[in-house]
Amino acid sequence: MKNKVVVIPGSFSLVSAYGGYDGIDIWLNKKLDKEKLKGADFIIAHSAGVNYLFTQPILNNQKIILINPLVKKINLISLLIRDVRFFIAEGIDRNKIIPLSSWIFASIKVLRLLKINVLENLRKLPKENVVIIRGTKDYYFCDSENANLIKNEGFILYEVDAGHNWNKNIAEVVNTLIHAN
């Protein structure tokens, strides 16, 4: 039986950037098909997409794969500084981000979602249903301090050769996790 997988992309990213998985383009200013989440066996959420996930109902039988989550709450100034450093270091692939026409909508959504306490919500989930993947070169959002918080809470953490963005190394771990079930 094939697992149904749904992706919730990171800030300003499109689902199409995630290797062909189905998903919800939460950063576009359009109606969302939230029903996709209810029927998913696996939910992959990346970065601020994790914050969005925690605004939705999660079923006890769903497997959750979190990629570079923003575990530790940060203030707006810190976020902006990290954003600038991130964009300088990792760049922007224009084919993977939302159109400029959705940027104001996405910016407002990010600010709202940053109020979500990711760590508090993680604690509510069954640990056996959650896997977290961190890029070891993510110095901006899911840094070593966030990794230590994740480990101290007892969650499974895979650390791979990646930055903050989805890449082939993250994709390989995700693929292995999905096909192992």
Regions found by a protein language model. Name each.
Residues 44-53:
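Gly/Ala-rich beta-loop-alpha elbow adjacent to hydrolase catalytic centers
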Residues 6-10, 46, 134-135:
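The conserved beta1-alpha1 loop
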Residues 41-44, 63-65:
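Residue in the alpha/beta-hydrolase core beta-strand immediately N-terminal to the catalytic nucleophile
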Residues 6, 22-24, 65, 131-133, ...:
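Hydrophobic/aromatic beta-strand patches that form the interior of the parallel beta-sheet core
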Residues 1-32:
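Short, surface-exposed "cap/lid" segments of acyl-processing enzymes
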Residues 69-141, 147, 153-170:
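The alpha/beta-hydrolase serine catalytic core
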Residues 56-59:
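Aromatic pocket-lining residues of Rossmann-like dinucleotide-binding sites
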Residues 167-180:
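Post-His helix in hydrolase/transferase enzymes
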